[in-house]
Amino acid sequence: MNTHIQIDGQGEDTIVMLHGWPDTGALWARQVADLQADYRCVRLTLPGFATDEQSRALSMDEVVAWLDESIRFVSDRPVILMAHDWGAVFAYAYVRAHPERVARLIGLDIGDTSETFTRRLPLKHKLMMLGYQLPLAVSYRLPRRWATPLTRRIARVLRAPAAPESIHAGMNFPYFQAWFGGKARYQSSTEFIPSCPMLFVYGTRKPFQFFAPEWAQKIAALPNSQVTAMRAGHWMMVDAPDEFNRIVREWLARTPDAD
């Protein structure tokens, strides 16, 4: 698996930034510009996302192994892990598997998506998810000359900020794995509650949320943890970067690492 890593800044603490669909490490440009004076900022690009290079969908275990290898490569100390969208799903799985490697966790817009959440999701919201996720999942196996234009159209409808020319059907493997992965589907049977301090930030300008209110309440009640809503869409770090950066900075400044 190819690993694309960008490192900026010289701070004592390392922030590892992990994007989702249909992005790359470029998503975090405004955050790196703001944080690199005080933190070592590491941007990872998911396997197969930088170019259409991934020939198969990765299992959750494989993604977690890739993430562990990448984090150990950039830091021998526990890191601050900041993740969005599918990156958040993968980050939560990583924290489950390697809690000792994450000092603080910042999850963005995607919360716990275990079976309990999906069962309780209203039918209307399930159909909305189906409307874009299933075409992306199916397109992963279609010829790229058809699949990539379809992927770009869906990204445009969802107002994804990534440059259209950077978007391709190879980015759709998480949806394929989630829908058609069989025994290796991306699905957890247990609720995710981290053992480290967590900041969870979500945008309110969306048809529905990717977490249950009860889960957010549990996160907010954890020691040194916080849940913050922003008047922004799914990509709040792009929609309102100054406000987002302030929220992250203030939380990091007053939050100690997990013991």
Tell where the protein language model's regions lie, with residue ranges:
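Conserved HGGG/HGGXW glycine-rich cap/lid loop of the alpha/beta-hydrolase fold
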Residues: 7-51
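Residue-level signal for the nucleotide or nucleotide-sugar donor/cofactor binding architecture
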Residues: 23, 58, 62, 239
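Hydrophobic residues on the short alpha-helix immediately C-terminal to a glycine-rich phosphate/catalytic loop
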Residues: 31, 94, 247-251
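Flexible "cap/lid" subdomain of the alpha/beta-hydrolase fold that forms the substrate-access gate
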Residues: 42, 49-75, 79-82, 86-229
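A short loop-to-beta-strand scaffold at the N-terminal edge of the catalytic core in hydrolase folds
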Residues: 1-7
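Catalytic histidine-centered segment of alpha/beta-hydrolase-like enzymes
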Residues: 232-241, 245
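Generic structural signal for small/hydrophobic residues in well-ordered secondary structure
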Residues: 5, 19-20, 28, 35, ...
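Glycine-rich phosphate-binding loop signature in dinucleotide/nucleotide-binding domains
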Residues: 9-10, 71-77, 251, 255
